[in-house]
């Protein structure tokens, strides 16, 4: 009887038991530090729903989701203070990584990346974080909160100096001064072949974090902090496809700041779902 029913509350084709899964999806419905328009807490389920409108096969990568072993644990159960919530994210992420499974996370706002990276730090002595984003996210604090989504890469920088920031076109003077003073690898353009070759030469584990607002609002209106003069969907995908050369080094990724209440015809959620599909086909 069960074969006649479908569970649309999970990412498409996420039918593998956790014990057998090589990749683990979960979402973090958290947006308490959003600095402009809240709503990213609903992003994970919007991405899941949108995934069912896509094909399982990628003609670019010549792979099909049906070939992969991954599960979807749905929403992480969150309660308590921000510190307690981040502690939960950290411990869950660490347990998944300890089992040599790839981690696939849907936000939620961008602050949730920090406790995930703390878990990465627990497992790997040295690693790389690649960020696609419109914003530096390098503030030391925002409205008195050092764990704000505006501070996430500043906190990550305290864990690893190997951060690569692409698509950045917004931030306050303090952030840009910090980047220049410390010679951070921060570019307004998307990652190109030369960038990838340098990353490849470092030969370290890689975690990828994608803030959907790296795209121009015309392509991704469903986000809480839209930033004009961004990139097209095709430009972003062409950059992401370069990661295939380091796919064996990628230990996980997140897609954050999808806020469906501001979306138009679900184009932001659909784009996020396709990003997830392509990266999963690449790394699993």
UniProtKB/Swiss-Prot annotation:
Gene3D superfamilies documented for this protein: Ureohydrolase domain
Q: Can you quote the record's cofactor note?
A: Binds 2 Fe(2+) ions per subunit. Can also use Mn(2+), with lower efficiency.
A GO BP annotation:
putrescine biosynthetic process from arginine, via agmatine
Q: What is this protein called?
A: Agmatinase
Species whose genome carries this gene: Methanocaldococcus jannaschii (strain ATCC 43067 / DSM 2661 / JAL-1 / JCM 10045 / NBRC 100440) (Methanococcus jannaschii)
UniProt keywords, alphabetically: Hydrolase, Iron, Metal-binding, Putrescine biosynthesis
Q: Which InterPro entries match?
A: Agmatinase-rel, Ureohydrolase, Ureohydrolase_dom_sf, Ureohydrolase_Mn_BS
Q: Which NCBIfam families match?
A: agmatinase
Q: Would the keyword Metal-binding turn up in this protein's UniProt record?
A: yes
């Amino acid at each position: 009887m069960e074969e006649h029913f479908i569970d649309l509350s999970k990412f498409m084709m996420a039918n593998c038991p956790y014990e057998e899964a090589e990749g683990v999806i979960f979402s973090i419905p958290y947006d308490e530090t959003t600095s402009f328009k809240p709503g990213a807490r609903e992003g994970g389920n919007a991405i899941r729903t949108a995934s069912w409108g896509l094909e399982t096969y990628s003609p670019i990568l010549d792979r099909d989701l049906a070939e992969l072993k991954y599960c979807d644990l749905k929403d992480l159960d969150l309660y308590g203070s921000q510190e307690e919530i981040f502690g939960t994210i950290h411990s869950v992420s660490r347990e998944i990584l300890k089992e040599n499974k790839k981690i696939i996370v849907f936000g939620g706002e961008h602050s949730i990346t920090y406790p995930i990276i703390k878990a990465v730090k627990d497992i790997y002595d040295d690693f790389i974080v690649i960020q696609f984003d419109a914003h530096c996210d390098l503030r030391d604090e925002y409205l008195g909160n050092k764990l704000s989504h505006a501070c996430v890469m500043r906190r990550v920088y305290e864990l690893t100096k190997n951060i690569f920031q692409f698509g950045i076109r917004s931030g306050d003077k303090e952030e840009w001064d910090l980047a220049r003073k410390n010679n951070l690898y921060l570019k307004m353009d998307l990652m190109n072949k030369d960038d990838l070759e340098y990353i490849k030469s470092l030969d370290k584990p890689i975690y990828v974090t994608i803030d959907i607002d790296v795209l121009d609002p015309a392509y991704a209106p469903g986000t809480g902090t839209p930033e004009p003069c961004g990139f097209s969907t095709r430009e972003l995908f062409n950059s992401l496809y370069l990661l295939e050369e380091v796919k064996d080094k990628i230990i996980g990724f997140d897609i954050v700041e999808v806020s469906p209440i501001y979306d138009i015809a679900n184009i932001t959620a659909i784009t996020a779902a396709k990003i997830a599909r392509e990266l999963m086909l690449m790394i699993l």
